[in-house]
A protein has these predicted regions:
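Conserved NTPase motor "head" modules and their coupling/switch loops across ABC/AAA+ ATPases, GTPases
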Residues: 60, 64-171
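Extended, charged alpha-helical "arm/stalk" segments used for dimerization and assembly
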Residues: 1-56
Length: 171
């Protein structure tokens, strides 16, 4: 039934979407994709299993096996990120389409000032596998993986400034 009629639950914390921590926005995005994309759950579970293994290696300082997990984490992370990006792009386009429909005679003009962007969790210009290898010393010190899809976020900007710094919570 849920595959035929996809929906995203809205609850009392949803109003604070822009103000909530990144993991809240990731979870809401992931739930929506899970409903609409058959292969998403497999990629999601595979990525987070690989992340857990890599973080265990970092915590226990067993570097000899980290390269295998870097590759697995990177491969699954790219799949996961591509699904998130595609879904986000479609949702964003639909959002702006709806705003354009209601905007001509309403108070929704301020929505045109807001830019909604997806941050994938690492520099888009860099290869994730290379980045994991390059940041290995930093990750070892922190005993966890510092970049990847588990750090992705949806950002709300007004004139390239984080909307949370400009708007009040009610706005």
């Amino acid at each position: 039934l849920i595959k035929e009629f996809p929906c995203t639950p809205i609850h009392n914390n949803t109003f604070s979407f822009a103000d909530a921590p990144p993991d809240f926005r990731r979870k809401l995005l992931d739930r929506s994709i899970f409903i609409s994309e058959k292969s998403f759950s497999e990629s999601w579970f595979s990525y987070y299993r690989s992340l857990k293994q890599r973080n265990s290696i970092l915590k226990n300082n067993r570097i000899s096996s980290i390269y295998t997990w870097n590759t697995k984490l990177s491969d699954e992370g790219i799949k996961l990120t591509n699904m998130r990006k595609n879904f986000f792009k479609k949702t964003k386009n639909e959002f702006y389409y709806l705003i354009d429909l209601i905007q001509p005679n309403s108070v929704f003009d301020f929505f045109n000032l807001i830019e909604i962007d997806f941050f994938q969790g690492w520099d888009e210009k860099k290869n994730l596998n290379d980045l994991l290898t390059h940041n290995q010393d930093i990750d070892l010190k922190r005993k966890s993986t510092t970049q990847g899809p588990h750090k992705s976020d949806i950002k709300f900007l007004i004139n390239n400034i984080d909307a949370r710094q400009i708007l009040s919570r009610g706005e």
